[in-house]
C-alpha cells in the first residue's frame, strides 16, 4: 500500500490504517479479529479492490460497495461536489513499478523465498536501511523518497518486488 494512501487515511480522514498482508480473505479475517478484540474496524479492503464492511457482516460484496459509492456520489452532488472530490487530497506516488522475480530450480519455492527475505532483511539492517515493522508479509524497505517491498506470491512461484517513489526517476 502506498505511503500516500496511509497519509490520506490518517491525516485527512483521521482513520487508522493497518497495512496488512495481501489476500482479501486474510484482510477480512484480520478485520473481524480486530473487532472481536475490541478494536473498531468497520472496513476491510484489499489492494485488489475486494472489500467488506462490518455493517454487511464482512461479506466480500462488490454490489453492496457499489451502492455505497452511489449514495456517496449522490450526497456529494447535493453539496455541489463530485464523488471524485472526496479524494482530492489523495496523492499518487511519482513512480510505481512491480517486477515479478521467478523462483526456479528449487523443489520448495516458499522455503527458498523465505531464505531470500531473511537475507534481504539481514543485509538491509547491516547497511542501516530502515525495515518497516511490523511487516505482515515480506520485507519492506523504507527510504526518504519511497519504499520497496519484496514478498512471496500468494499463488505462484515468484517474488513480487513493488517499489514506489515520491520523486520521478
Regions found by a protein language model. Name each.
Residues 1-169:
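Phosphate-binding and adjacent anionic-ligand microenvironments
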Amino acid at each position: 500500500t502506498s505511503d500516500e494512501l496511509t497519509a490520506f487515511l490518517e491525516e485527512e480522514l483521521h482513520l487508522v490504517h493497518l497495512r496488512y498482508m495481501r489476500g482479501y480473505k486474510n484482510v477480512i479475517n484480520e478485520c473481524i479479529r480486530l473487532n472481536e478484540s475490541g478494536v473498531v474496524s468497520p472496513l476491510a479492503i484489499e489492494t485488489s479492490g475486494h472489500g467488506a464492511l462490518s455493517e454487511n457482516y464482512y461479506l466480500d460484496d462488490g454490489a453492496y460497495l457499489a451502492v455505497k459509492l452511489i449514495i456517496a456520489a449522490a450526497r456529494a452532488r447535493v453539496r455541489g461536489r463530485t464523488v471524485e472530490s472526496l479524494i482530492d487530497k489523495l496523492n499518487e506516488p511519482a513512480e510505481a513499478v512491480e517486477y515479478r522475480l521467478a523462483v526456479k530450480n528449487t523443489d520448495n519455492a516458499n522455503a527458498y523465498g523465505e531464505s531470500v527475505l531473511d537475507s534481504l532483511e539481514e543485509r538491509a539492517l547491516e547497511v542501516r536501511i530502515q525495515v518497516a515493522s511490523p511487516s505482515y508479509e515480506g520485507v519492506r524497505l523504507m527510504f526518504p523518497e519511497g519504499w520497496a517491498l519484496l514478498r512471496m506470491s500468494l499463488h505462484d512461484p515468484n517474488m513480487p518486488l513493488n517499489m514506489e517513489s515520491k520523486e520521478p526517476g
